[in-house]
Amino acid sequence: MRNHWPWMMVGTLMIGVGVAEAQQNPGDSAQTVGKGKVLDLVFRVEDMGGKVQSLEIKESATEVRIDLAADVLFDFDKADILPKAQSTLKQAADVVREKAKGTVRLEGHTDAIGSDAHNQKLSEQRAEAVKSWFIEKEGLRNMSFASKGYGASRPVAPNKKPDGSDDPDGRQKNRRVEIVISK
């Protein structure tokens, strides 16, 4: 159904034009073209599942790695999947369906704020949340998943600037869930 939504929007727009034309009041702005009127319609269409984030996919000879930014998936310091994450997770699930031949690893990572124990637990919960979402929402029950949390032990960017001050951009990059698909 996902590929048909643009046509559904065109159909809805055509119906809306007919209704708008039938309900047009005298003095409303419209152009007459031939026998019909052309109304200026302005509207905004949004994906109800949230903004679709582009996936960062790295592919090598041995694996495919998808990086999902935690700020797209979760609120800060939480492990509950946000509604806005659905489109991004659906994209990732499509890649998993296409590429996975064996066990798919889900690796959770955090920034360095908080204790090591807290970050370890949070990273495990986040990896498990993505695994559960794939199984429950995308129906990937027949695939093998392994989830693991790494806490703040595998940063991809510095958590602090060279002068020792906080680096919010670096910390944001470190908060992520990686999907690793072995070839």
Residue ranges and their predicted role:
Residues 1-63:
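N-terminal targeting leaders that direct proteins to extracytoplasmic destinations
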Residues 23-29, 35-36, 83, 91-94, ...:
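Compositionally biased, non-globular sequence tracts
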Residues 45-59, 74-107, 179-183:
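Periplasmic peptidoglycan-binding/anchoring modules of Gram-negative envelope and division proteins
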Residues 55-57, 64, 96, 137, ...:
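Short secondary-structure boundary/capping segments
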Residues 64, 102-104, 145, 177:
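Conserved beta-strand core positions
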Residues 65-76:
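Acidic/histidine-rich, surface-exposed loop or edge segments in extracytoplasmic proteins
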Residues 67-69, 104-109:
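Glycine- and acidic-rich phosphate- and metal-coordinating loops
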Residues 109-183:
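Periplasmic OmpA-like peptidoglycan-binding domain that tethers envelope proteins to the cell wall
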